[in-house]
Design a protein with these regions (language model features):
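Active-site phosphate-binding/coordination module
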Residues: 61-130
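Conserved catalytic cysteine-centered active-site region
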Residues: 211-217
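Short, well-ordered amphipathic alpha-helical segments that serve as non-catalytic structural scaffolds
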Residues: 51-64, 182-188, 373-380
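Glycine-rich beta-strand-to-loop/alpha-helix junction loops that act as flexible
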Residues: 72-78, 206-208, 251-254, 391-399
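Enzymes and membrane/adaptor proteins characterized by extended Gly/Ser/Thr/Asp/Glu-rich
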Residues: 163-172
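N-terminal glycine/serine-rich phosphate-binding loop of ATP-dependent small-molecule kinases
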Residues: 1-92, 146, 218-223, 412-414
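Active-site core segments that coordinate phosphate-bearing ligands/cofactors
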Residues: 5-6, 18, 103, 110-123, ...
């Protein structure tokens, strides 16, 4: 067996999973799972990066004790970054994408470049959390003035692990600073963001060797660049049907609706629909739309406790089936549902129809609203690509929810097949095996 470790860092949890490959197939073993949550510090929402690094090391140590690892790879959510100095020391915090101050950066950026021009270059949807707007809001700050490089979260982990400095391309594309055609940093976009080009690292491809870990317990363990944006890794693992057009619905904290193309779609219609063109493994294009996924449900679970503990998803789904169908509705993408905390009250204040009065009604409202939003975007994807899709491949944690998959099939009148639940971690591992010559 060839064993590799996939480190998959999500906005609400992280995990280290070991995958084994031989002629009979693939095995998996979840070694370590840990919670992740942005916290308010001095009125800013930040990630605890030292904790994420420590938990990554803990998981890899346990994996290495149990398996003869050939390599490891790290993926995470997109857009957030740290700044290092010339000695690879982290300058300041890693701000979280749900920090409301990012809105100011987006407004400032578009005083220097029009939205149509920006989309024609980068092809990335306009949403306040994008890296380019975060950096625009931070332009001229002390840490950017003193900093050596801006590194996205997986690249920051790699830097602290091996000293490597670079920016993996699938994650780089999501910053909205990379040219969708040339796959290089756009001087025009950087100028509009008031960002000196020397702060950005060279772009590298998935499968690049990043050196070996320097931690005493992980010394010598190779680190391989994977499709480090978690969606990029998930798409690597999607079992696309070659006989009929398929699209992907990745049901995680975010729900992503998209497909894989050979080229970006930079039309006016795509821009007006705010679809995004992300670079995928093998220089493909992931043409997709982000909508709020399980985030609202996760927040409800955190508020509506059972004896001080979060209720199991299975219990919530069972309770929900006793609630009235289509009694209430929210727009999951309304910015009011973006920040953490107080979600139940915000639903009460912004719901259409009956105001939910118990947990089962809240859960049904949230999941029905999510499915309706996803189904709408599925139809729009077909229009923008001029394709009649015949199958939906559901991946991610939400694909475990049979009733949600059935609702989606009913709403779209398409068969829904489930791909790997841990598609991101599997895709992470597949790229490692390709890089190591095992596939």
């Amino acid at each position: 067996l060839s064993y590799v470790a996939a480190v998959d860092l999500g906005a609400t949890s992280g995990r280290v999973i070991v995958f084994g490959l031989d002629e009979s197939g693939i095995t998996s073993d979840e070694i370590h799972r840990f919670a992740n949550q942005a916290k308010w510090v001095d009125d800013r929402l930040v990630w605890d990066f030292p904790y994420l690094l420590s938990e990554t090391i803990t998981g890899l140590k346990r994996a290495r004790e149990k398996y003869p690892l050939v390599s490891c790879g790290v993926d995470s959510w997109a857009v957030d970054y740290g700044v290092i100095d010339g000695n690879n020391q982290l300058l300041g915090p890693v701000y979280a994408y749900r920090d409301p101050r990012h809105d100011d950066g987006m407004a400032e950026f578009y005083t220097r470049m029009t939205w149509p021009k920006h989309y024609s270059i980068a092809g990335i949807q306009k949403i306040a959390l994008n890296t380019v707007y975060q950096l625009t809001g931070e332009a001229g700050s002390k840490r950017l003035s003193e900093g050596y490089k801006v590194l996205l979260v997986p690249d920051l982990i790699a830097n602290q692990a091996t000293g490597y400095v670079g920016c993996e391309i699938t994650n780089a594309s999501h910053t909205a600073m990379l040219d969708a055609r040339t796959h290089r940093w756009s001087p025009e976009v950087l100028s509009a963001a008031s960002l000196p080009s020397h702060l950005l690292a060279d772009v590298v491809q998935p499968g690049t060797g990043l050196g070996t870990w320097r931690d005493k317990d992980l010394e010598g363990l190779p680190l391989v660049s994977v499709a480090s944006h978690d969606t990029g890794s998930a798409f690597v693992a999607v079992p696309f049907n070659s006989e009929r057009p398929s699209l992907v619905v990745n049901l995680g904290t975010w729900a992503l609706i998209g497909t894989e193309l050979s080229h970006p779609v930079l039309t006016d219609s795509a821009r007006e629909a705010n679809f995004t063109n992300e670079i995928g493994y093998g220089s493909t294009t992931r043409f997709l739309k982000n909508v709020t996924g399980m985030w609202i449900l996760e927040q409800i679970r955190a508020e509506m406790l059972d004896g001080g503990k979060q209720p199991d998803i299975e219990l919530l789904l069972s309770e929900m089936q006793g609630a009235k169908a289509f009694a209430s509705h929210i727009n999951p993408d309304d910015p009011v549902f973006g920040p953490p905390g107080g979600m139940v009250e915000r639903i009460r204040q912004n719901v259409k129809g009956d105001i939910p009065s118990n947990r089962s009604e809240f859960v049904r409202c949230v999941l029905e609203s999510l499915v309706a939003r996803v189904a709408q975007r599925v139809g729009l994807l077909g229009e923008l690509t001029n394709t009649t899709y015949q199958e939906i491949v559901a991946v991610g944690g939400g694909s475990r929810m049979d009733i949600v998959c059935q609702w989606l099939a009913d709403a779209t009148q398409m068969p829904v097949v489930t791909g790997p639940t841990e598609a991101t971690a599997l895709g992470n591992s597949l790229v490692q095996w390709l890089a190591n010559g095992d596939l």
